[in-house]
Amino acid sequence: DYSSMVNFARCKCLGANVLRGPDQLPWDGKLEYDWQLWIDSDIVFDTNKFYQLILNSVPAEAVTKQQVLEPMKNEKGEVIKNKDGSDATKLAGYNIVVDPEKERPIVSGWYCTEDGRTTSVAHWLDEEDFAANGGVMNHETLDTIQKRKKPFTVDYAGFGWLLIKKGVFEDFDENGKKKMPYPWFAPKMQVFESGTVQDMCGEDVSFCLDAKEAGYEIWCDPRIRVGHEKTRII
């Protein structure tokens, strides 16, 4: 199945059907999943980059370690007792427990764009700064992103290497309204403060804008760089 409209093609990747309405679920709720990994066909990566992306979704504050104790035994295999009669124990290891409420819902790595200078992640600018920047958003550059040492939030991340947690497309707000209704990738008009500067944005930008408006943070890990195959791999 094929569509030349990128925004519609992305919806089709999630099994969408226009007849199911705005509250529909990816794959009609029939496919169990934990995360969606979006990969463009021109991205160059290995399994290490994939596992790094998974780790980026689980920040340190989401993880707790629970001690696992086991009885201490003597040479005869008998359980050693404490003075109070309880079993003596020793540390056998840890159980790692992840709080799903603290996982990052949308995470990405990054890649270089065809100009060889800018990257696939960007920050929003107000109208004055947008004009001063030549009518483009404040993209991280190769220089700026390489100075970053830990994950940071962005307003936009390209879909070439992006991980989305289950719930982003499924959740409802406190009023029972779908946070991210279908069509999930519909292009939108970006209108700045004066109303005189406006333009259509791409389907990935509009998804990110809608996700942020719905309360989801978008995290980029500067340590996860993947290749981008253009006239050369960058």
Q: What are the residue ranges of the model-derived segments?
A:
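Short, Asp-centered acidic motifs that coordinate Mg2+ and/or phosphate
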Residues: 35, 104-106, 218
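Conserved catalytic core of nucleotide-sugar-dependent glycosyltransferases
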Residues: 46-189
